[in-house]
């Protein structure tokens, strides 16, 4: 029987939430530290299923990692060459581990088998593999063409230094290639073919690579130039920012319930694109206060939440939260340019539409968009399926702030990025029943 949690109708108290570390930054940092030529102490690392999969993989690859305290560990860099040249790596459903490790191992070469849960084997990787093969990598599909699982063999340098790659399915493919090619010591030029989605995630990658000593020239997100003789050198200490995508639920709570909610761990100078979510809330009725290490959202009780029509390409994960915010408005809301939702942890456009309809919303799905017309009052005690997708579970918790109880199936799927989410969410709410 599926485990579930019932959230009673509630309203948040004025609250402060300390965010867990960013998944995007945590897994990038772990891999870059492992490939550096020195030792790096990482602070505030996210503890989650996805980071556990990366840590397990690095251990199997021979990387020495000292666990010092919760959220703090010391990574002994390998100088850009993993000690173990053969390994079987299970990476769950962690795209932030699977894609970058695929590229790094393909560039270094060896005898590696990479696989995951069934959903990971439905998430495309062909555009990345195509680019790696142009760079001389030996990557073989072990199941369906263009999808994991994969076998990686020895790379043969064919002398090709201009690598085209598509960026319209997932920006993680470009991230993986950017992080891997410096391991060759050769100068490379990566050229985008077609549109690049989710550019803010590429900004995270480039800023972290710079912190690890590799400066990539970004020519308008069309061409990326990797210098010759590049190598990774880690900072002695690196602090992981709080998770900006995870912040979206609490910031939305402040807007929906017209109560000040502050998150700490991110701020005005965050390197994560999803901090732009707060700016989108500001456009539809929120008051936002920015600090160096916090963001606070509230709303005057007499001010309505405004409907929106948003191109959400820049905040694809946080945009899911806006789909719930739509129910706090009185008109049809639209999220556009969200085609990447279809290749995430689940097919998110269809999943979101299915569950919003259970609440009485009228929903129109398109290939790259979703249109949501809110009901007068959401259906109470709707049973929400989460599709083993952490963001579905966290998003729909906000329904309890709209005056009705809601039942969330499989709440433990939040362990992917935010294991304590429901405890934290409950701690900042007062039951209205």
Swiss-Prot record:
Entry's EC annotation: 2.5.1.19
Binding site for phosphoenolpyruvate: 23, 95, 123, 172, 348, 391, 416
CDD domains reported in the protein's UniProt record: EPSP_synthase
Gene3D superfamilies listed in its UniProt record: Enolpyruvate transferase domain
BP terms from Gene Ontology: amino acid biosynthetic process; aromatic amino acid family biosynthetic process; chorismate biosynthetic process
Residue numbers annotated as active site: 317 (proton acceptor)
Residues binding 3-phosphoshikimate, per UniProt: 23-24, 28, 170-172, 198, 317, 344
SUPFAM superfamilies: EPT/RTPC-like
Role according to the record: Catalyzes the transfer of the enolpyruvyl moiety of phosphoenolpyruvate (PEP) to the 5-hydroxyl of shikimate-3-phosphate (S3P) to produce enolpyruvyl shikimate-3-phosphate and inorganic phosphate.
Entry similarity comment: Belongs to the EPSP synthase family.
Protein name: 3-phosphoshikimate 1-carboxyvinyltransferase
């Amino acid at each position: 029987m599926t485990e579930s949690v019932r959230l009673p109708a509630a309203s948040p108290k004025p609250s402060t939430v300390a965010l867990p570390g960013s998944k995007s930054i945590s897994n990038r940092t772990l891999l870059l530290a492992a490939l550096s030529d020195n030792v790096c102490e990482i602070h505030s690392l996210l503890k989650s299923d996805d980071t556990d999969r990366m840590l397990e993989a690095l251990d199997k690859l021979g990387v020495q990692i000292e666990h010092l305290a919760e959220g703090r560990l010391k990574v002994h860099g390998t100088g850009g060459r993993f000690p173990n040249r053969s390994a079987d790596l299970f990476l769950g459903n962690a795209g932030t581990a699977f894609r970058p490790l695929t590229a790094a191992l393909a560039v270094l070469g060896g005898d590696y088998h990479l696989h995951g849960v069934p959903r990971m084997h439905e998430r495309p990787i062909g555009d990345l593999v195509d680019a790696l093969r142009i760079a001389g990598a030996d990557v073989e599909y072990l199941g369906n063409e263009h999808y994991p699982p994969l076998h990686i063999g020895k790379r043969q340098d064919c002398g090709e230094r201009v690598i085209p790659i598509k960026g319209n399915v997932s920006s993680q493919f470009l991230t993986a290639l950017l992080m891997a090619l410096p391991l060759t010591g050769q100068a490379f030029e990566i050229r985008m073919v077609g549109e690049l989605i989710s550019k803010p995630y590429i900004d995270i990658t480039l800023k972290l690579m710079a912190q690890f000593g590799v400066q990539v020239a970004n020519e308008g997100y069309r061409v990326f130039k990797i210098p010759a003789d590049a190598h990774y050198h880690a900072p002695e200490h690196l602090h992981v920012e709080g998770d900006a995508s995870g912040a979206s639920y609490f910031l939305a709570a402040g807007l929906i319930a017209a109560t000040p909610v502050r998150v700490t761990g991110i701020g005005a100078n965050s390197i994560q694109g999803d901090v732009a979510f707060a700016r989108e809330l500001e456009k539809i009725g929120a008051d936002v206060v920015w600090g160096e290490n916090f963001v606070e959202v509230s709303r005057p009780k007499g001010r309505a939440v405004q409907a929106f029509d948003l191109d959400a390409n820049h905040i694809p994960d946080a945009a899911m939260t806006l789909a719930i915010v739509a129910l706090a408005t009185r008109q049809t809301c639209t999220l556009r340019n969200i085609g990447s939702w279809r290749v995430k942890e689940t097919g998110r456009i269809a999943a979101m539409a299915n569950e919003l309809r259970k609440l009485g919303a009228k929903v129109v799905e398109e290939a790259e968009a979703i249109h949501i017309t809110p009901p007068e009052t959401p259906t109470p005690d709707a049973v929400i399926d989460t599709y083993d997708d952490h963001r579905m579970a966290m998003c729909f918790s906000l329904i309890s702030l709209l005056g009705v109880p809601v039942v969330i199936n499989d709440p433990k799927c939040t362990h992917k990025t935010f294991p304590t989410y429901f405890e934290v969410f409950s701690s900042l709410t007062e039951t209205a029943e």
